[in-house]
Amino acid sequence: MRFVLLLAFAWLFCRVSASAAEPELFESKIRPLLIARCHACHTDTASGGLRLDSRAALLKGGKSGPAIIAGKPDESLLIQAVAHKHATLKMPPAGQLDPQDVLNLATWVKDGAVWPESPREFFLSKVKPVLDANCMGCHGDAARAGLKLDSRESALKGGKSGPALVPGDPQKSLLMQAVRQDHDTLKMPPAGRLSDDTIANLGQWVKDGAIWPEVKGPEVPVYNLRPDQKAFWSFQPIRKPAAPQADRPEWNRNPVDQFIYAKLKEKGLTPGKKADRATLLRRATFDLTGLPATREEIAAFVADQSPDAFERRIDKMLASQQYGERWGRHWLDVVRYADTAGDSADFPVPEMYKYRNYVINSFNKDKPYDQFLREQIAGDLLPAKDDNQRWEHIVATGYITVARRVGVSPTSDRHVTLEDTIGNFGQGMLGLSIGCARCHDHKFDPIPTADYYALYGIFDSTTYPASGEEHNPYRRDMTYRVGKEKAAEILKPFDDAFAPWKKLERKKFDEYQEFQDKKILTPGRSREVVWKELTQVREDLKPFAEAYPPLETAWAASEGKPHDSKIQVYGEPKNTTALVRRGFPLILGGMKVPESETGSGRLELSQWLTDPKNPLPARVIANRIWHYHFGKGIVATTSDFGVRGAAPTHPELLDYLAARFVEDGWSFKKMHKLILLSETYQLASMDIPANSATDPQNNYLWRQNRQRLDAEEITDSIRLLSGTLDLSMGGRHPFPNDRTYFYRQHEPFTGNFESPRRAVYGMQQRIVKNPYLDLFDGPDGNLPMSERRSTTTSLQALYLMNSEFMDHQSALITDKLLAAGKTTPARIEWAYGTIFGRSPRPDEIAQSEAFLKKLPWTSFVHSMLSSNPFLFVD
């Protein structure tokens, strides 16, 4: 009773005074009380939907309504609750407040609930959001110019220009000079000057001592794997099953056949006949080399009836350079290989061919696949026996740096390049769409967003070279074979001579750009005049650019500053939450990069990836090898082994192949032999109506699948037949000197360097597609392609019938045909054997003779090159 009377008396006689409304009451009595008795439940946890850490939060209230009504303590839920006058709300739970504390709260509410900002609150409300929105993109983990603005210590340390802050002195603080834009060179942020109010707030903060309270970050959300997620087939350990016995001897010699035959019997299907020897050799030669078997090779193979004749032919093809060119192209499809960067100006990457050739050579050497993967993820961190191997390992990291650069300023949009890297790593090496977890937990697969950013931190701790960008066209962070320091020493005198020209060129370019932004009224100055001056400067600097010594460089990855990354809310780099330790997907073990590790984590990633206990890499690549031989994988979605992907048609066979692949030293060539020597591979492609009724898609392989030649096979084969194909290995494309790259969004790089070599060596641009490759469903340097679609369009037919290339090649082949035979039947026989890889049937001879009575031999050859027997492999 005494307490209620005291409170009523206080409210009755409390008068509004200047002192009551001053901040002292809040700072001395109210804030400490709220922190001590209320914040445990009513800050981040927001019990009852109520926060009590700001005036706005109190006015907003929680589930029961506003906590206070300024000027009306008797109507305020907060006062009713702490005074225990509310019917249900009695606060705080630990016990009633002292009457004087209740009186202070009531007085404070009566006087308008004044809530002056503390230095901490001022920083959190007025300063930190500005830094996060305008500075952290460049001066967070990226530490542009050596400066980080993620803590007071980092700001005091500063970067290359010196300390960013001088607490108490806004005039001397580089940060303030930069945002006021009264510094000679520092003008920040790059996107435009901040508002006067924002600059004033920053200045006040610095003047008051630059108080920077430590803000505890949010916790990484807990992700609990469900039993059904853990039990999904692709995440299970690889176990090598015993091959089932077949009741037909020819289907009981090869484990591939035993598994296939068992499934055929289960489905009530009968295997078809074996392909004839000419068809079989043509099929295998295209499969392994991407080129047709010659008339002489086919004739010799048909005549050779020894039991090991086909195996010897396989060995010969696997030992040829053409094997690596064919199978290296498959891998280049997966990693979206290109010779340009992909930014708005599509800057060239002259060194990219080294990675391409590394891939081709790796297949030719039958490099173990696990080693192949380790070199591409962390080659620069692996031991090497000599300098040549060290350099080979470094070049291998082109897998990482081939990631696409995006936009006018790729450096500022680095996160998009990292997204491209992670997406390709997931699809290409694990068969998982990890990129779908960038903005939120994966909707179907057990991949939380934290897994995405655990990998993000690894690649964000890696240095990617820059090919140039519109406003800074000079390359950076290249890897020199002689080493960074030695290269700097060698290049210094050339850099010194070139520097004035670089500065002049940028000055002229900036002057030219000004005409886009504002009117220039200086007499005699116009956009055209300045452009002419700019092009002259660029012409004048060429001799200085070309004077540089040709130091060997690679488009390679290297170690950056190791750090963990924060989860980006909806994939927005400027809106981050919890910090995630670098590591690997939870469903595959969830191991973390050790805290003691001083590197990026790429080495640990490469080791985890290729651990035989990891079930995905071997399964994925075994399935892809099968796909390239049969036109369809055991898992039809060759880069998606997740919930939304296709289920395996032969799960036991897939596990057998994966286990066998690892047992055989991760060898591609041994896997080829296992598959090609099977009855399954050697089946004819002819239809069996009874089987088609049950299995129209041939999912269970009762026949071989007929496949169209891909874009490279078509052009390479035609050139080989005409005698114009250069079989030597390709090298660097004839790009201009890299110090003269002045490409921009509206004048991007374009080029199409014609070459007589195989198509795999052709220059592949990202923004401008090769019209021929695009027409015949060729590779896209912007997207991973483990499966190429096979379309049939009228434009393809028009190209085959009317293009200059086809006309010229047909004429060259005709010259060879006319020289090879003196009679019409002999020439027809030569044409069929050379172009179709078989002898003509009697009806085909008659049709050909009738055709030749009306049209010349060139038209005959041209029509054969445009026909299905040439364009398809049975």
Predicted segments, located by residue:
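Bacterial N-terminal signal peptides
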Residues: 4-15
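Solvent-exposed helix-loop boundary motif
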Residues: 19-106, 110, 114-203, 212-256, ...
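Primarily short, surface-exposed interaction patches in extracytoplasmic proteins
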Residues: 247-322, 336-385, 418, 445-446, ...
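Charged, amphipathic alpha-helical linkers/stalks
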Residues: 472-505
